[in-house]
């Protein structure tokens, strides 16, 4: 309860099949990529009634999570982040189960 937090909002988009063109799982655990960071920021601003929201401000919100061990940035990849908190117990799904639900193709790492 309470106002929605950025990480919850991102998770909401990530579990919505219709949002896969702007944000999606990479198929590697809880890693995800903002394919259209400006659109993600616009929607976040709309949700929070902050019309001036942009990716720069949104990424500041994401950086705030680094120390809290909620989300980390994936080094060397632009707009790629990873949930490092225990999402599995929070959601009751493994990343693989969640990927399957939203239609993320499994990775071939063999």
UniProtKB/Swiss-Prot annotation:
SUPFAM superfamilies: Winged helix' DNA-binding domain
GO molecular function, one term: sequence-specific DNA binding
Subcellular location: Nucleus
Keywords, ordered alphabetically: DNA-binding, Nucleus, Transcription, Transcription regulation
Signal peptide: none
GO BP field: cell differentiation
Gene Ontology CC: one annotated term: nucleus
Major location category of this protein: nucleus
DNA-binding region in chain numbering: 1-84
Sequence similarity: Belongs to the ETS family.
Role summary: Probable transcription factor.
Protein's recorded name: Protein C-ets-2
Biological classification of the source: Eukaryota, Metazoa, Echinodermata, Eleutherozoa, Echinozoa
